[in-house]
Amino acid sequence: SSDVCSSDLNYVGIEMYDSVLLRALQKREKLETEGIHLDNLKFMCMDARLLPEVFDKGEVERIYLNFSDPWPKARHAKRRLTSREFLARYNEILAPEGRVEFKTDNRDLFEFSLEEVEAAGWKLMAHTFDLHHEDAMMEGNVMTEYEEKFSSMGNPICKLVACR
């Protein structure tokens, strides 16, 4: 996005599966052939459980979780990137004013996430069950491919913003 191009911020895209990461790298390469350079965008293939081993305390200002795997089975709840276990990991690397922004079209995962934010003692700064009809929350929204796809199918997009 143009936000990334013009920004003095660094972005790190983290993906556990190399096939997904490969697609991101191919897209970046295509943009660069079009003259769009994303020098401040890096990618890492890793398990997000290792975040505290990769980033220093307070090093990360924002964590964007976009259309994460919902892990629908109850026994897999701890694998969800918005579980209290993951919020504890984010707590270790977020700057004092840091925050987590989460988007999904999966209502069950979103409701689970709202509960986990509260259970972890985090503050819910904003949330909506229908992002594309909330002007205030749409401001500065960067549409992902999944967001465009699900939204065009009529699926409402849920979003929350949380801080500690």
What feature does the model see in each segment?
Residues 74-77, 99-120:
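Conserved class I S-adenosyl-L-methionine
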Residues 9-14:
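Short beta-strand element of Class I
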Residues 113-164:
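Class I S-adenosyl-L-methionine
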Residues 25-62:
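S-adenosyl-L-methionine
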Residues 17-18:
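Conserved SAM/SAH-binding beta-strand->alpha-helix loop
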Residues 49, 54, 60-81:
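A short SAM/SAH-binding and catalytic strip from SAM-dependent methyltransferases
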Residues 1-6:
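Short, small-residue-biased leader/transition segments that mark boundaries at the very start
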Residues 80-99:
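A short glycine-rich, Lys/Arg-flanked "PGG" loop and its adjoining helix->strand segment in the class I
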